[in-house]
Design a protein with these regions (language model features):
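Alpha-helical membrane insertion/targeting regions
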Residues: 1-217
Length: 217
């Protein structure tokens, strides 16, 4: 059992390291170009490795929080990648989109309940569960709403792709910080990347909205 855990932990670390590097390259590379596409694919499959190895380790050595966060993290990467295949309003959500959204919504709801229970017990880590759960449930619920009533915005796919891929990167970077950053309080290490990353995503969206607006002039 211990050997299996070590093997999957090694895969988990390798996948996480690859995701951090490939994700950074994809973010700075020109969008739609060869380097961005290759780095993006590498990032996506690295995230799949991180999620799969985390789920297996959770079964070998039960850790509920890690299990649900793994689902949330990969859901972000999965939906980000799927948006590149669903650019048109006529591209309806497939069975895998609905399945992933329902799983993510379930994970988000469980994290919220778990967070409330932990706070009730006086454990501040409950806030981490609540924040991750709220994002997970919010994203998945909004996705299902848009499956039924597709958005009218032409570049919706691009902004969703950007938001989800960077969101997954934030989750991976958070895991890196939790393991390596020891000089900050645990709660800050868990939540600061999300706070900073959310502002970063907002700034990036403003930049591209202005860029696309200028291109239409």
């Amino acid at each position: 059992m211990e050997i299996l855990i070590k093997i999957f932990l090694a895969l988990h670390i390798a996948g996480g390291t690859s995701a951090l590097i490939a994700g950074a390259v994809a973010m700075v590379a020109p969008k739609g170009k060869r380097v961005h596409n290759i780095a993006g694919k590498t990032y996506y499959w690295s995230m799949a490795t991180v999620c799969a190895s985390a789920v297996v380790m959770c079964f070998l050595k039960p850790q509920q929080f890690l299990f649900y966060v793994a689902i949330f993290s990969f859901y972000l990467a999965f939906t980000g990648e799927r948006m590149t295949k669903r650019k048109r309003q006529s591209d309806a959500a497939a069975i895998q989109d609905w399945t992933a959204a329902i799983l993510a919504a379930t994970a988000g709801a469980i994290l919220l309940v778990r967070g409330g229970m932990l706070l009730n017990e006086g454990t501040s880590f409950g806030w981490v569960n609540i924040v991750f759960g709220a994002f997970c449930l919010g994203f998945s619920a909004n996705d299902m709403r848009l499956f039924v009533k597709p958005p009218q915005e032409k570049m919706h796919w691009f902004f969703t792709h950007l938001t989800r891929m960077i969101g997954a990167y934030i989750a991976t970077f958070t895991a890196f910080c939790v393991v390596n950053v020891k000089f900050l309080p645990s709660l800050a290490v868990w939540l600061l990347p999300t706070v900073i990353g959310t502002f970063g995503i907002a700034a990036w969206q403003v930049y591209y909205r202005r860029k696309f607006a200028l291109q239409r002039v």
